[in-house]
């Protein structure tokens, strides 16, 4: 269920969101990053992903989000669970008047580049970087760099 903007703003202001992030690796061991068009993390390079909607199963969210973010609908079984992560932002989708808090379920995926049909709704452009390159780049958001940093492990379960 997608909410009206004012209802979604009330949710973001008051609660954490649940989202899925996709750590997509190609055959050369490079990671897919998109340059975000929207807040939060606008302008930064970030792994693809998105939020889980109310009453949406993880299986349905995974399929919907891989279609929306990668241009190919994949089943949950295509991903390898990579842990629970916490993302905090000082801004939100509509501005700077309140923060955004995500609880993120990370999933690693190996996908052939030729299978992807990368959309332009959330990211203005895309690139592939090695883990070493993305760790060294200040233009890659810290929350995406954390997936490869030994100093920022997933939340223990």
Curated annotation (Swiss-Prot):
It comes from the Bacteria. Its cofactor is Mg(2+). Its EC number is 3.6.1.-. The keyword Ribosomal protein does not apply. InterPro entries: GDPMH (IPR033715), GDPMH_Gmm (IPR028613), NUDIX_hydrolase-like_dom_sf (IPR015797), NUDIX_hydrolase_CS (IPR020084), NUDIX_hydrolase_dom (IPR000086). CDD domains: NUDIX_GDPMH_NudD. Pfam families: NUDIX (PF00293). Binds 1 Mg(2+) ion per subunit. A motif (Nudix box) lies at residues 50-71. Substrate binds at residues 2-3, 8, 36. Residues 3-153 form the Nudix hydrolase domain. Keywords: Hydrolase, Magnesium, Metal-binding. It is an enzyme of class 3 (hydrolase). It catalyses: GDP-alpha-D-mannose + H2O = D-mannose + GDP + H(+). Mg(2+) binds at residues 49, 69, 122. One of its GO terms (molecular function) is manganese ion binding. Signal peptide: none annotated. Belongs to the Nudix hydrolase family. Hydrolyzes GDP-mannose. Homodimer. HAMAP family: GDPMH_gmm. This is GDP-mannose mannosyl hydrolase.
């Amino acid at each position: 269920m997608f909410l009206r903007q004012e209802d979604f703003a009330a949710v973001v202001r008051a609660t954490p969101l649940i989202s899925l992030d996709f750590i997509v690796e190609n055959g050369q061991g490079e990671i897919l990053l998109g340059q975000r068009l929207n807040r939060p993390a606008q302008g930064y390079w970030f792994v693809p992903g998105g939020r889980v909607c109310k009453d949406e199963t993880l299986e349905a969210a995974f399929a919907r989000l891989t279609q929306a973010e990668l241009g190919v609908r994949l089943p949950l079984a295509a991903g390898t669970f990579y842990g629970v992560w916490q993302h905090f932002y000082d801004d939100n989708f509509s501005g700077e008047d309140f923060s955004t808090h995500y609880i993120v379920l990370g999933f690693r995926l190996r996908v052939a580049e030729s299978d992807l049909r990368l959309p332009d709704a959330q990211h203005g452009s895309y690139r592939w970087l090695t883990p070493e390159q993305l760790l060294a780049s200040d233009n890659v958001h810290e929350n995406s760099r954390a997936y490869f940093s030994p100093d920022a492990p997933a939340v223990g379960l």
